[in-house]
Regions:
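Amphipathic alpha-helical interface segments
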Residues: 155-159, 173-175
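Metal-ion/cofactor- or nucleotide/acyl-coenzyme-handling active-site neighborhoods
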Residues: 166-172
Length: 321
């Protein structure tokens, strides 16, 4: 059995749950950071194992990849929490060897825990693993009003200093608790990060355009995002460039300022589809020159401000008539 997943914190939680369920039946875990998505799909296809469980990966923009997986494997199960376009799943209903479980209200780790683990591991281990998945959920779904939010941010910061496969084993071997030295490491990382944030502001890597803040430092995007929103900014965008020259735009909307209809409209107007998460989505675009890049910034601000000014506090489903 193959496990195909993301490479982030939510993938770690999903891995822990999948491993707890299937153990040694999992022969290999494939990770993608989306930049190599098609390559990893092809690697999974040529792998001799015929059963694939996929977690925390969005196929909203890559339906052909999902078709290829299903057509080349005996059985594929997808557990995911990203948004998908309306009627996306209709074309997949023809496959008898495919099952999908989608819930965009919680992170993939919590879905995996609820779907895979009842009755599988001891109650104590299940509680400990669920507690970890809850912290992951607070980070991955960006629940900024949750009391665990700051701790979740620090957990994610620490996570990116580790090898995901080695960390998964270490947490499992420690009874679904973080390794004993994690607290000291997290404190040091947090203190170092605060200095990096200060440097980012001093080096003019943070720029405001009305209610929108642009951040040109992906490494400290999250702490700057939190700071900016605490100071009243409503949309924060991180812009950085991949090695192949393409630009990535990570967009985060402050919670509770737009209704769901407006959040969907924002995604449609900026990237042309409803994908990612309502308050957090990204897209990649080829930019040829500084003028095009400047126009992209202006477009993001314009679309957001227009929707912000026109936003009505009720979605159509909520209107009581």
């Amino acid at each position: 059995m193959i496990h195909f997943t993301h490479n982030d914190l939510d993938a770690l939680g999903s891995m822990l749950c999948v491993d707890a369920k299937y153990g040694n039946k999992i022969t290999k875990v494939y990770h993608t950071y989306y930049g190599d998505f098609e390559k990893q799909v092809n690697d999974v296809i040529v792998d001799k194992d015929d059963i694939v469980i996929v977690t925390d990966l969005s196929f909203a923009e890559r339906p052909d990849c999902l078709h290829k997986l299903i057509q080349n494997k005996k059985y594929v199960q997808l557990i995911d929490h990203h948004s998908y376009p309306e009627n996306f799943w209709l074309e997949f209903s023809k496959y008898s060897n495919f099952k999908h479980i989608i819930n965009d209200q919680i992170c993939a780790s919590l879905i995996c825990h609820g779907v895979l683990l009842p009755g599988v591991i001891t109650e104590n281990n299940s509680v400990l693993l669920k507690n970890l998945c809850k912290v992951i959920d607070v980070y991955d779904c960006w629940r900024e009003n949750d009391k665990l939010f700051e701790g979740a941010q620090r957990l994610n910061l620490w996570f990116w200093t580790k090898n995901i496969d080695e960390l998964c084993k270490a947490i499992k071997d420690n009874g679904y608790k973080l390794p004993s030295n994690s607290k000291e490491e997290i404190v040091k990382l947090y203190n170092d990060q605060q200095k990096e944030v200060e440097d980012a502001y001093n080096n003019k890597q943070v720029f405001r355009m009305g209610p929108v803040t642009f951040v040109f430092n992906n490494y400290v995007f999250n702490p700057i995002l939190i700071k900016e929103m605490k100071e009243g900014q409503k949309l924060v965008v991180c812009c950085f460039q991949f090695r192949n020259g393409d630009f990535c735009f990570k967009i985060r909307v402050k919670q509770d300022i737009l209704d769901n209809c407006s959040l969907n409209l924002l995604r449609m107007n900026i990237i042309g589809k409803i994908t990612g998460h309502p308050n957090a989505f990204s897209y990649v675009k080829k930019i040829n020159n500084e003028t095009e890049l400047t126009n992209e910034y202006k477009m993001i601000v314009s679309e957001f401000v227009k929707i912000l000014n026109d936003s009505f506090p009720l979605c159509s489903d909520d209107v009581p008539f």
